[in-house]
Amino acid sequence: MMKANFIVVEGLEGAGKSTAIKTVLDTLKAAGIENIVNTREPGGTPLAEKMRGLVKEEHEGEDLKDMTELLLLYAARVQLVENVIKPALANDQWVVGDRHDLSSQAYQGGGRQIDASLMKNLRDTTLGEFKPAFTLYMDIDPRVGLERARGRGELDRIEKMDISFFERTRERYLELANADDSIVIINAEQSIEDVAQDIKAALNKWLAAQ
C-alpha cells in the first residue's frame, strides 16, 4: 500500500488554490485514497490561526515589520507541522495543504527581498528535512490574480501590496519550482476545466510513480 504523503497547492492571490485543492481531493479519492487531512497556512491549529490573524490584518497605528511577519509565519508553520501534519502522516493519513514553506520563500524571500541565506537558515532550523512530497504551483499573472481577488471582496494586508511585490513573488516561485522536480507548474490562467484537467494529469502521473 502507498504510504501517506503531504501534498501542497501554492500560488499567488486569485490563482484558484481553493478550486485546485478540491480537484486534488477528488483525484486522490478517485485513486482510492480516502483518509485525508486538510490544512492551510498560516493557520491550521488554534494558536496558528491567531498568528494568521496577526499577519493578515491591518494594525492601526503600528506597522508590522517584515521580520516580524516572517517569524510569525514560521512560528505558525512549526505549530502546524508538529501538531497536525506529522502526526497525521504517522497515522497513515494523507495531508493536503493550502500553502506551505514555498510561500515564505516566494513572498518573504522574493516579494519582501529578505536575505536568501537567512531564509534558508530559518527553514532548515525550523523544518529540518521536512518538506511536501508533491507541490502544485498555480501560476498566474499578478494583475489577473489580483483582479480576481478584488472580485471576491475586500483585500487583506498582504493583498494590498503593490504590483512589483507580487511580480517579485511570482519570479521567485517560478525560480524555485523550476529547480525542484517535486513541484509542478500549472497554468492557472486557463479555463477552470483545463486547469482541473492539468492538475488531475500531473497528480495521477505522480501517484503512478509512487
UniProtKB/Swiss-Prot annotation:
SS bond partners: none
Keywords in alphabetical order: ATP-binding, Kinase, Nucleotide biosynthesis, Nucleotide-binding, Transferase
Entry EC number(s): 2.7.4.9
Pfam families documented for this protein: Thymidylate_kin (PF02223)
Catalytic activity, as annotated: dTMP + ATP = dTDP + ADP
Residue numbers binding ATP: G11, L12, E13, G14, A15, G16, K17, S18
GO biological process: dTDP biosynthetic process; dTTP biosynthetic process; dUDP biosynthetic process
GO molecular function (one): dTMP kinase activity
Gene Ontology annotations for the cellular component aspect, listed alphabetically: cytosol
Domain of life according to the entry: Bacteria
NCBIfam families to which the protein is assigned, alphabetical: DTMP_kinase
Family named by the database record: Belongs to the thymidylate kinase family.
Physiological role: Phosphorylation of dTMP to form dTDP in both de novo and salvage pathways of dTTP synthesis.
Name recorded for this polypeptide: Thymidylate kinase
Organism lineage string: Bacteria, Pseudomonadati, Pseudomonadota, Gammaproteobacteria, Vibrionales
